[in-house]
From Swiss-Prot:
Record note on quaternary structure: Part of the 30S ribosomal subunit. Contacts proteins S5 and S12.
Organism: Klebsiella pneumoniae subsp. pneumoniae (strain ATCC 700721 / MGH 78578)
The gene coding this protein: rpsH
Gene Ontology terms: cellular component: ribonucleoprotein complex; ribosome
MF (Gene Ontology): rRNA binding; structural constituent of ribosome
The keyword Iron appears for this protein: no
Highest taxon of the lineage: Bacteria
Name by which UniProt lists this protein: Small ribosomal subunit protein uS8
Function: One of the primary rRNA binding proteins, it binds directly to 16S rRNA central domain where it helps coordinate assembly of the platform of the 30S subunit.
Length: 130
């Protein structure tokens, strides 16, 4: 059976891993997943990530906790294969009044809503993280 939405699967693995207090989660890798993991690491939502394997690369995310609680309070898919959500630069949402981030896929790559606003770019809203 093929996976319909690999990004939603990635977000669910992160959510479930933190609910079970796992140190790390693994998943099949792709360029988009690595780009999302890079944004999550830069923003401090995950500890680290690495890609292992040549024929079937696996992405391993090291989850982050603060005083025993998961750093990621909520992670939510926005744009999905059945309903893509695109926003212009001045329509980009602020997640939790700026405390969270929106991960945006732009023509210049995957970045946060803050970085996209500064660069004057709009794009596809992949997910919200808080």
């Amino acid at each position: 059976m093929s996976m319909q939405d690999p990004i939603a699967d990635m977000l669910t693995r992160i959510r479930n891993g933190q609910a079970a207090n796992k140190a790390a989660v693994t998943m099949p890798s792709s360029k988009l997943k690595v780009a999302i993991a890079n944004v999550l690491k830069e923003e401090g939502f995950i500890e680290d990530f690495k890609v292992e394997g040549d024929t079937k690369p696996e992405l391993e995310l090291t989850l982050k906790y603060f005083q025993g609680k998961a750093v990621v309070e909520s992670i939510q898919r926005v744009s999905r294969p059945g309903l893509r959500i695109y926003k212009k630069k001045d329509e980009l949402p602020k997640v939790m009044a700026g405390l969270g981030i929106a991960v945006v896929s732009t023509s210049k790559g995957v970045m946060t809503d803050r970085a996209a606003r500064q660069a004057g770019l709009g794009g596809e809203i992949i997910c919200y993280v808080a």
